Amino acid sequence: MHEPLVRNGTSVRGWLRVTLALICGLSIWTATQARADGMETLMVPSAAMGRDIPVAFQAGGPHSVLLLDAFNAAPDVSNWVTAGHALSSLAGKGVSIVAPAGGAYSLYTDWEGDGGKQWETFLTSELPDWLTANKGLAPHGNAVVGASQGGTAALTLAAFHPDRFRYAGSLSGFLTPAATTMNGAIAAGMAQYGGVDTQTMWGPVQLGRWNRHDPAVHVQLLVANDTRLWIYSPSTLTCSDPAAMIGYCDQAQGSNRDFYHRYRNDMGGNNAHFDLPVGGQHDWGSWGPQLAAMSADLTATIR
């Protein structure tokens, strides 16, 4: 019997074993990475806006969390994914993650004078119906959570679409947009940072259509629907990320405190968590951890 060829004290058979082990190890590592990083980028068609919308998606269960971005939303990948660590915060919690991109300076509403911004229609009709048909998600009883402009929209969408959303979270949202000081700040900030005219959005303030999109005006709907709320807004007056808050961080907590009083004192609401701390920032350094903090409350509500 011939001995196998040996070089430097290692047989060819030994080299083969080592090589196969490395290949198997690499295959296992790659498979593990594929399982751990389960995000997909979906291109969801919107007939209302006449284009496909990029949506980050991580499957986790039949019910989902819709994540809405701050004013300076990225065009291709939601800041909830890149800065808010949403995928890791909600991984393994039994819920799916849905995070659309491209909603910068839109307040996620249907703009009266801009057909390319029909976000309420997309978020409450086109997107959930598409996810039900293509990903098997439940069309009703889900959560919506937003930062900054996304927080404003989250409460408004939940108020008017309670079948879609039983849970709503607002982090540094402007919750009294129809108030005189607040609507002036929104109009000025969106013009400065986004180059948009809010009269194209909801028309002139004096015509009253801003009221329809004001969570504080419709707080009675949230109470009547028994929507579970999570509200966070620090008292910080300065902006660490001005574009995310259109430069008006000093308006955020006052708006949230007004909403709190209307919810608790005027309407007797008792299905909400309020966190209005002295410390913290209106940025992803606070919003990301808040999503993690609310995750148990959120999943207990929608699962």
Label the predicted regions.
Residues 34-303:
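Non-catalytic cap/lid and distal C-terminal segments of serine-dependent acyl enzymes
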Residues 1-36:
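Secretory targeting and sorting signals
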